[in-house]
C-alpha cells in the first residue's frame, strides 16, 4: 500500500510538471485593444476571412489571443486555438527538425547524396533557357524586352551531386508550379503531385520533371523539403506520419499537429480575393502544384513534408516552444542545443539587409526593429494560405497568426498583415510604430 501511495505521488508530481505552470503569463501585453483594432482593419476591409492571433510564453501559458472574423462568411464558425488549419510551408520546419533528429542519431548526414536514398532521381536533368541560362539567374516576373523568353527549354546534365544539405537550403533544384514560365509550370502541373497515391508514386512523378538549376548554384524555394521528407522515409522505412508521431508529437505530448484530419473534426474553407471580392476559393484556384492540393484524408497515404501538415494554433505553438526552449518540451529533449544553433545560423541569403535564412527559418535583422515590425533576432516562417509564426528568444515567447487565405486582392495593405500585427505587439517594448517604408 505504501508503495502504491509513493507511485501515485510521483505520477501527480510528473503530471503537474507537464501542465502549464500558471494561468498568468510572465509576458505582459499592455496594448491588447490596439492589437485587436489593427487586426480588425483587415476584416473590415474584407481582405481576410478571419485572423486568429496567439502568443504563448515558454511555459505554454497564453499571454494574448484574439479572433477577428468576417461574419458574412463565417458567422456559424467557432474559430479558436483548437481549430484545424492548413499550414502548408509551416510543415517545412517540422520536417527539417525531424531530419536533424535523424542526423543526431546517425541515420542520415548533411553530405549524403539524395540518390543514395532515392535512386529514381539519378537521371534528373537540369532545364536551361534558350539562352542556355539557369532559370533562377533571371527574375521572370520582370518584363525585359531585351532578352529572349525562356522557352523552349533545353536539358543538360546536373553538374553537381545533390545532397541533403542542398535540400535543407532550397538549393537542390526543385520548385513549385509558380515560376511564371509556362513551359516549366505546365510540366509540374501535368504531373499533379498532390494527387500521387503514395510516396512511391510521388517519386515516380517527380523523376519525370527537370531540375530548375544545377544543385547548389542558387537558392530557389520549392519542393526541396518535400524531397527531404521522402529521404527521411527511405532512410528509416517509416512514413513521415509515423516519424512525426514517434519522434515529435508523442514524446513531447503535442496535440494538434498532424498530416491527417482527425475523425469528427472539420476544416475551414479556403478563401480567395482574386476577383477583388472575398469569397470561397474555386476548385483548382490554389495553383502551387498546378492542380490538386493536399486532402488530409487518412486513407490517402501521401505525406508532403514541405506542404502537407495541418495544425491547431495551440498544437503548433507547442512545437515552436520546443525550438524556443532549445530543443526540449515537456521534459523531453528532441534536439541538442547545438543543433538549434545550426538551424538558425546563416546558411543562405546572407547578404540580405532584412535577415538571413537558417534551414528554412528566417532570422530578422535591424530593419524589423527600425521599421516597427518587431525586433531583430526573431525566427520567422509562414505558409501558403497566410499562416505566420515567429519565435522571440529574447523575451521568451512564440507567436502565431492564423488565417486561410490564398489570394489577397488588396495586396498593398493586405500583405502587411503580419508586420502590422507583430509591430503593434512590439510597440510598447520598442517605442517604434509600424512604418511601411
Regions found by a protein language model. Name each.
Residues 63-66, 396-409:
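Short, well-ordered beta-strand elements
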Residues 378, 385-398:
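Short, surface-exposed beta-strand/loop micro-motifs that present aromatic residues
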Residues 39, 54, 59, 86-114, ...:
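Active-site SXXK
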Residues 123-376:
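Short, surface-exposed loop or secondary-structure junction motifs
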Residues 28-87, 107, 123-131, 410-411:
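Short, conserved catalytic-motif segment at the N-terminal edge
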Residues 1-8:
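Sec-dependent signal peptide recognition
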Amino acid at each position: 500500500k505504501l508503495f502504491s501511495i509513493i507511485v501515485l505521488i510521483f505520477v501527480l508530481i510528473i503530471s503537474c510538471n507537464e501542465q502549464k505552470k500558471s494561468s498568468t503569463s510572465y509576458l505582459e501585453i499592455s496594448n491588447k485593444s490596439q492589437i485587436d483594432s489593427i487586426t480588425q482593419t483587415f476584416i473590415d476591409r474584407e481582405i481576410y476571412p478571419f485572423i486568429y492571433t496567439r502568443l504563448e510564453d515558454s511555459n505554454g501559458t497564453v499571454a494574448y489571443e484574439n479572433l477577428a472574423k468576417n461574419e458574412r462568411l463565417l458567422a456559424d464558425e467557432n474559430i479558436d486555438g483548437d481549430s484545424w488549419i492548413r499550414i502548408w510551408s509551416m510543415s517545412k520546419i517540422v520536417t527539417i527538425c525531424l531530419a536533424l533528429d535523424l542526423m543526431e542519431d546517425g541515420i542520415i548526414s548533411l553530405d549524403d547524396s539524395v540518390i543514395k536514398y532515392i535512386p529514381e532521381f539519378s537521371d534528373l536533368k537540369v532545364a536551361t533557357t534558350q539562352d542556355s541560362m539557369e532559370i533562377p539567374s533571371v527574375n521572370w516576373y520582370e518584363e525585359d524586352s531585351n532578352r529572349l523568353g525562356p522557352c523552349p527549354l533545353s536539358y543538360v546534365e546536373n553538374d553537381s551531386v545533390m545532397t541533403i544539405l542542398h535540400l535543407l537550403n532550397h538549393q537542390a533544384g526543385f520548385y513549385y508550379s509558380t515560376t511564371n514560365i509556362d513551359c516549366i509550370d505546365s510540366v509540374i502541373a501535368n504531373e499533379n503531385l498532390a494527387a500521387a497515391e503514395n510516396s512511391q508514386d510521388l517519386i515516380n512523378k517527380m523523376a519525370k520533371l527537370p531540375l530548375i538549376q544545377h544543385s547548389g548554384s542558387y537558392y530557389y524555394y520549392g519542393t526541396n523539403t518535400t524531397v527531404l521528407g521522402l529521404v527521411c522515409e527511405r532512410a528509416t522505412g517509416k512514413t513521415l506520419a509515423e516519424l512525426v508521431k514517434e519522434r515529435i508529437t508523442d514524446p513531447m505530448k503535442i496535440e494538434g499537429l498532424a498530416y491527417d484530419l482527425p475523425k469528427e473534426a472539420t476544416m475551414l474553407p479556403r478563401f480567395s480575393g482574386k476577383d477583388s471580392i472575398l469569397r470561397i476559393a474555386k476548385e483548382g484556384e490554389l495553383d502551387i502544384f498546378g492542380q490538386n492540393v493536399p486532402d488530409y484524408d487518412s486513407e490517402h497515404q501521401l505525406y508532403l513534408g514541405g506542404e502537407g501538415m495541418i495544425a491547431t494554433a495551440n498544437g503548433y505553438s507547442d512545437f515552436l516552444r520546443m525550438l524556443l526552449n532549445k530543443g526540449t518540451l515537456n521534459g523531453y529533449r528532441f534536439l541538442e542545443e547545438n543543433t538549434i544553433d545550426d538551424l538558425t545560423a546563416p546558411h543562405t541569403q546572407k547578404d540580405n539587409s532584412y535577415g538571413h535564412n537558417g534551414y528554412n527559418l528566417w532570422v530578422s535583422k535591424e530593419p524589423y526593429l527600425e521599421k516597427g515590425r518587431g525586433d531583430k533576432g526573431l525566427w520567422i516562417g509562414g505558409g501558403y494560405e497566410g499562416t505566420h509564426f515567429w519565435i522571440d528568444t529574447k523575451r521568451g515567447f512564440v507567436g502565431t497568426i492564423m488565417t486561410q487565405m490564398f489570394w489577397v486582392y488588396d495586396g498593398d495593405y493586405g500583405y502587411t498583415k503580419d508586420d502590422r500585427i507583430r509591430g503593434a505587439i512590439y510597440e510598447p517594448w520598442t517605442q517604434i510604430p509600424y512604418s511601411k517604408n
